Amino acid sequence: MKLSKLEKALKKVRVTPQRDDTYTIGNVLWAIRMCRLMGLDCCIDEATAAEVAILIGRFQSLDLQDSPLKGKDEKAILTTLKVLWSLLAGHHPENSDMAEKYWEAWTIRERESQKEEEGEITSIYPQLRKNFPAVSTSDGSPRYDPDLTKQLKIWADATEKHGVDHHAVNILGVITANLTQSEIRLLLQSTPQWRLDIQLIESKLNAREHAHRVWKESHPEAPKTDEIIGKGLTAAEQATLTTQECRDTYRQWVLEAALEVAQGKHDRPGPINIHQGPKEPYPEFVNKLVTALEGMAAPETTKQYLLDHLSVDHANEDCRAVLLPLGPSAPMERKLEACRAVGSSKQKMQFLAEAFAAINVKGDGEVQRCYGCGKPGHIRRDCKNQKCFKCGKPGHLQRNCKSKNREALLCPFWAEERIPSGEDFCDPVCSPVGIRLNRQPFIKIFLGGRWVRALIDTGADEVVLKDIHWDRIKGVPAASVVQVGVTGRNIARRKSNVEWRFKNRYGIVDVLFSNTPVNLLGRSVLQSIVTKFTLAAHTKQIQPLPVKLHGPGPRVPQWPLTLEKYKALKEIVEELLKDGKISRTPWDNPFNTPVFVIKKKGGSKWRMLMDFRALNKVTNKGQEFQIGLPYPPGIQQCEHITAIDIKDAYFTIPLDENFRQYTAFSVVPVNREGPLERYHWNVLPQGWVCSPAIYQTTTQEIIAEIKDRFPDIVLYQYMDDLLIGSDRPDHKRVVSEIREELGAYGFKTPEEKIQEEQVQWLGYELTPKRWRFQPRQIKIKKVVTVNELQQMIGNCVWVQPEVKIPLSPLSDLLKGKTDLKDKIKLTEEAIQCLETVNKRLKDPEWKERIKEGTELVVKIQLIPEGVVYDLLQDGNPIWGGVKGWDYNHANKIKKMLSIMKKLSRIVMIMTGREVSFLIPGDSEDWESALQRINTLTEIPEVKFYKHACRWTSVCGPVIERYPTYYTDGGKKGSKAAAAYWREGKIRREVFPGTNQQAELKAVLMALQDGPAKMNIITDSRYAFEGMREEPETWGREGLWKEIGEELRRKEYVGVSWVPGHKGIGGNTEVDQEVQKALQGPITVSLPQEILLEAGETKLVKTGIFWEGLRPCKLRPEEGLKLKGSLIDEELQLEITNTQNSRVGIRQGQTIGTCFIEAIPQAIEEHEKWHTTAEILAREFQLPRRVAREIVHRCQACKRTVSCPRRGTNPRERFLWQMDNTHLEGKIIWVAVETNSGLIEARVIPEESAQSIVFCILMLVYRYTVYHIHSDNGPCFIAQKVEALCKYLKITKTTGIPYNPQAQAIVERTHRDIKDKIAAFREDCETVEAALSLTLVALNKKRGGIGGHTPYEIYLESEYNKYQEQQNHYNNFKTEKWAYVRDKRKVWKGPYKVLWDGEGAAVVEENAMPTLYPHRHMRFIPPPNTDTQDGNL
């Protein structure tokens, strides 16, 4: 802000609210001057609010206890600065108090922002800890341990000079006497300057740990390895839970390892004792180091680690200065190239001469310059201003330099360098994770016209460079200053107004020059180029995958929640918002998805869920990459295994920014306390259909990188569970690096979820060599819900490889159950099945994993429900299960081949190898059965074991010379009948059962009565296929079991099938016998006692009202001379006494039998089409009472109640009413012909004019349409529909708006269609199929006017139209003549008829057309050509 504007703004601010005095520019200048007196620099010209805020903070941090400014002046200065800050920040305070409030509000916001940033870093990097000696208390919080601090100090003093030597080992034995395992590890890690010694100690400890794990397998009574090393336990738990023996063992391991390291360093020459001499060439030093490492007994990884670090740390001072910027992990070729010019003076000068040969080479037009001063006319060795290339000071050369500081000057002092651009800077300092602390934080900055590489030093106030840079840096020399540091007092030269540049930032700074070992970049520059320093690790960015919708986004409103659930949801949302997983959505986002919370199992915590069904419907779904769980036997054997769990896996992967708006949800307060709080997801939400596929795609790339980096490890991934196996001795290091790689992408792998050696993974327990199912128990309750029973069955199916029992007792209980809350009582068989499962899961057996080169065999055992199989390796089962029969195949061998094919596929997936089978029976029987199958494509390798199993069948094709039995069965009501027929021999049997049972009973009867060799012919496909499969006793139960036993006694049975009711001899006879058995006579008795005189006739009730039977004929009992017939309407029996004497009939006395006629056919017709009573009575000649009773007893027709018939409409031929209705989410177009009631309907995709146009075209080419009447719906009054009707010359009218009676006929039809669809819906898969059956029922099976169906009435209309057209055509085509009678009743003619209409005709009389009625005309055939007009 300019001074003029600032002065005007200050005049509007009062000093206090009570006074009218205002601030002036002089007050501000006084405050700035006072700050400068205290050493605080500030310039009022072009000052910003941020600079003033920094000035206020620095002023408040001053100690003014003994200063003359203490008191009123201090408060006046602070108040004036705060007023200045508020004006520069854009506020308009009226007085100083308001400026104070603005300042307090801003500081509070800054403090909260800083806390949020610190919380974010802590949540992303929870493993960050301060390096201090602390132990964990019982509640998990750290506290300082003063005793451990003393021991750390003793250990540091012991290893300060020579590292881990014999003296340090003795000290270590004393101070670790009472320490736990974690405290000993903390002690070792507290000496970072001797990290090579510690690395060797840890390598030897890992070797001892591995050896103990191997030894522990054969000595189970010994302590566990994890207990000895204290793995998975806190310091407090190690002190209380682990035994003293375990702690002493670990301490002994540490002392032995430390002693070996000390002996290797000091007893014999080793790599640790090799150092580069001051003038020794670097390649010679590296060769000696490699030779020493080759003779060292250590793993290759340890040797490589030592080579990388010793080649830098043990190099001389000159080489180390060059190698430190490269880092220890740089390739050895790069290190050798960098140190090529380091060594003797001759080598250094030769390198410089080669590097800058182009400067001293004289070319065309070029002037030779001195490399030292840059002046032309002489070279460097003749230069009078000699300067040292080592320290930069004049007066001596490099070979005579006594300074220990060295700066590599590869550019002449006088050379100009261009001003850099943003692309020249490669150090990402401005980002919070830009500076890596695994090496010294150097950056390259353009300072005073030169590139300078400086070390970031937050403890330095100013920029401090080496003295060598004094002549190179452009600036104004200023007075020297006194530096006070860790080395004491030092006088440094100073240059002011030095320009610096870094990326897109620049400024002016003072630079100090002193005898410093390294260039330092202090806070004077850092505060401008670095915003903050955070302890953050380097992370790799995950690119979100794009997602698209194929429809509109979800707009489902949020339903209300209880107060308890609202509070829980609010708490979860705040936590997610704090972690950055969700964000507040903009006000213009119209999409919404409902959200709710449920309680987690076994606790009071809540879990947030979202109903993504609407969003999932319109999301373009991808293909999930995870196709199933890995089989544990197929996991490769390893020496070490580790299981890792990824925490919040979905929440680590970002969601596509363009898609985030569709995941918006709302938090609605109770009683509408305030407005909605709207959020959307920034990461993958749970429950969204694409979250698994995106997660799998992302992690697949990361896992591929890890496998490429470690090709010798075994890595299994299932969603967020990882299993790592390897044979490496440094397995833990590999696991640590994999976790670091995952952490680089933001995936968290908590320590508490890491398992080693014996792990629980995906429901299994795994060791390096074996596996088993985790022990578990299924809770058994006598009464369960459908949902609970489904969960039980799912758990049992999961452990089938262990239990290997059929689950049919449990699955049979679910038949017919649709509601998940229905109660089911477990049967004894089901409870016994669950108890068997629990017994086998109490302590599952350990099984081996698949070994390379071993033979795999699948052994199959037969059970009634299917087969039990075991995958054998060296005779021991490693996998198994139960497979049920596939009844789609024709015989048993096809079923077995199908199961073997499935098992081969399972083993192929598990191992990638072929497998052989061990099945029951013998090879001859098996090969004989295979020869009968003509469609075999693949036969697996098979071996056999002894078992009573026959693969061939006695059933085959019919042989004519054997006797043939025709069988049939049927059912009526609850009664079933079975019969067989053979050359007039008949056997019938009636029993309660089903139709299939009747068919099987007939076959069983024929087998029982037939010879050893016979034929059976049936019209039942069920019985025919079952006979071909040969139902043995082990395969089926019930009638099939009895049939199988009978088949064992036969030598040969020919089986064939014929279609029923086709007049085939034998089948027709047996069918008639079954019908007779089902239609047997029904006895008739009277419900009350009657007395009949001789010749008397009475009407009595028969007592037969239902079962679909119509008594048609009455046969009296012997001794009764009665005559009877049925009265249709009343179902009464008219009985006449034909005897000469009185006859008395007691109550309940049987008077005769009635026989069935036509009723079964009527019932079958109604069950198919739900025909009306009028049509049944007409087609089957039934009494209307019986027909109505048939309809009344139909449950589907009971549910369909017709709507009341209100409203009338005009009815005429070929007038169609149209409308749309909705059912089950479908749109049904309906058209009804008003004269006949004929209905046409179809399902259309949408209510649009285009769909109505297609429907009208379909109606026109099927029926005659003169007139269309509809409502005022947009799709019916559209321009397309009107134009089509006009083109087809169809009259188009609409009804009265908002008056349903204008469409009364079609509205009634809507209800009729829905009722009929409801009746047919159970038998149809789709609405379209049910609609087709409905049209048949309503058009052809429903009585209308005069008892005719709508279809018949419409056909009559079409016939009448045809007759009219024919008459009209004949009137013009056929030549007619007629005699006519005039008014005088005189007949004249004949005249030619010009036109013949209805009731009258026009004749040509005397060359004039004359009209006569038909009653005055007599038509005659055309006369001959010579006929003349005349009078009769």
Curated annotation (Swiss-Prot):
Q: Where does Zn(2+) bind?
A: 1166, 1170, 1194, 1197
Reverse transcriptase domain mapped to chain residues: 579-766
Residue spans, zinc finger CCHC-type: 368-385, 386-403
Annotated Peptidase A2 domain ranges read 452-525
Instruction: Give residue ranges for domain RNase H type-1.
Output: 959-1079
Top-rank taxon of the source lineage equals Viruses
Task: Give residues annotated as binding Mg(2+) 2.
Answer: 968, 999, 1019, 1071
Catalytic activity, reaction form = DNA(n) + a 2'-deoxyribonucleoside 5'-triphosphate = DNA(n+1) + diphosphate; Endohydrolysis of RNA in RNA/DNA hybrids. Three different cleavage modes: 1. sequence-specific internal cleavage of RNA. Human immunodeficiency virus type 1 and Moloney murine leukemia virus enzymes prefer to cleave the RNA strand one nucleotide away from the RNA-DNA junction. 2. RNA 5'-end directed cleavage 13-19 nucleotides from the RNA end. 3. DNA 3'-end directed cleavage 15-20 nucleotides away from the primer terminus; 3'-end directed exonucleolytic cleavage of viral RNA-DNA hybrid
What are the entry keywords? Aspartyl protease, Capsid protein, Coiled coil, DNA integration, DNA recombination, DNA-binding, DNA-directed DNA polymerase, Endonuclease, Hydrolase, Magnesium, Metal-binding, Multifunctional enzyme, Nuclease, Nucleotidyltransferase, Protease, Repeat, RNA-binding, RNA-directed DNA polymerase, Transferase, Viral genome integration, Viral matrix protein, Viral nucleoprotein, Viral release from host cell, Virion, Virion maturation, Virus entry into host cell, Zinc, Zinc-finger
Q: Which GO terms describe its cellular component?
A: viral nucleocapsid
Integrase catalytic domain mapped to chain residues: 1206-1358
Query: Which residues of this protein are catalytic?
Result: 457 (for protease activity)
Site (Cleavage) location in chain: 125-126, 351-352, 432-433, 522-523, 1151-1152
Recount the PTM note.
Specific enzymatic cleavages by the viral protease yield mature proteins. The protease is released by autocatalytic cleavage. The polyprotein is cleaved during and after budding, this process is termed maturation.
Where is Mg(2+) 3 bound in this sequence? 1219, 1271
| Residues in the DNA-binding region annotation | 1376-1422
Q: Coiled coil where?
A: 815-843
Note whether Repeat occurs among the keywords: yes
- Residues annotated for Mg(2+) 1 binding in this entry: 645, 720-721
The record's section on Pfam families has: Gag_p24_C, IN_DBD_C, Integrase_Zn, RNase_H, rve, RVP, RVT_1, RVT_thumb
For biological process, the GO terms are: DNA integration; DNA recombination; establishment of integrated proviral latency; proteolysis; symbiont entry into host cell; viral genome integration into host DNA; viral translational frameshifting
Further remarks about this protein from its record: Gag proteins are synthesized on both gag and gag-pol polyproteins. Gag polyprotein (AC Q82850) is produced from conventional translation of the gag ORF. Gag-Pol polyprotein is generated by a -1 ribosomal frameshift occurring at the gag-pol genes boundary. This strategy of translation probably allows the virus to modulate the quantity of each viral protein. The reverse transcriptase is an error-prone enzyme that lacks a proof-reading function. High mutations rate is a direct consequence of this characteristic. RT also displays frequent template switching leading to high recombination rate. Recombination mostly occurs between homologous regions of the two copackaged RNA genomes. If these two RNA molecules derive from different viral strains, reverse transcription will give rise to highly recombinated proviral DNAs.
Job description of the protein: Matrix protein p16 forms the outer shell of the core of the virus, lining the inner surface of the viral membrane. Capsid protein p26 forms the conical core of the virus that encapsulates the genomic RNA-nucleocapsid complex.
Q: What is this protein called?
A: Gag-Pol polyprotein
Which organism does this record belong to?
A: Jembrana disease virus (JDV)
Q: What is the lineage of its organism?
A: Viruses, Riboviria, Pararnavirae, Artverviricota, Revtraviricetes
Q: Which gene encodes it?
A: gag-pol
